[in-house]
């Protein structure tokens, strides 16, 4: 096991984090491949198994900073060919990748929604969200805040997603997900929980993959 140098004076929690980072093969892989985040490998692993990223798609990436998912999407969807579209949005400034438009702002802002729609020039094939609330250290609170972001992402998907489209979003396992799973099951033909290998075993993080989007009015008719 590798141990970081100059541990003296650091808190025990910092020492544990540094040791874990040094011994994590996915952290090394992220650095070696020039990826902006470990999350890029998670997206890659999920797509390797479920094949939802296809050439020349129209995609929206919510909470796109620092841009790891953007890198994978651009490459796998071959957006450097000038066909398809990738719109990323985040509160933080994010460097663009080939075939992308990056917007800095809040998806709550109606003007931001209109700007996203103008770049898409139609409906999106996929809406992705790796959004997570800033942690407080109080797990129930952190869980509820992240579930709130998931609900926002679902509402956003209703605005831009094409019939038959795909939705992938970060979630946390816990007591509040049943109502949100209900929202997804009403809108999509299939909903799955995913846990990519690059997501740490001890983490409560999971992802929800929903495929076969039905517009809300169509979903209501299907239930009647």
Placement of each model-derived feature along the sequence:
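Class I SAM-dependent methyltransferase Rossmann-like catalytic core
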Residues: 1-55
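Conserved class I S-adenosyl-L-methionine
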Residues: 55-65
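Glycine-centered, small-residue-biased loops immediately flanking beta-strands
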Residues: 57, 84, 165
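Conserved SAM-binding loop of SAM-dependent methyltransferases across substrates and taxa
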Residues: 66-81
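Short glycine-dipeptide loop
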Residues: 80, 161-166
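S-adenosyl-L-methionine
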Residues: 83, 91-136
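A short glycine-rich, Lys/Arg-flanked "PGG" loop and its adjoining helix->strand segment in the class I
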Residues: 147-163
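Class I S-adenosyl-L-methionine
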Residues: 173-224
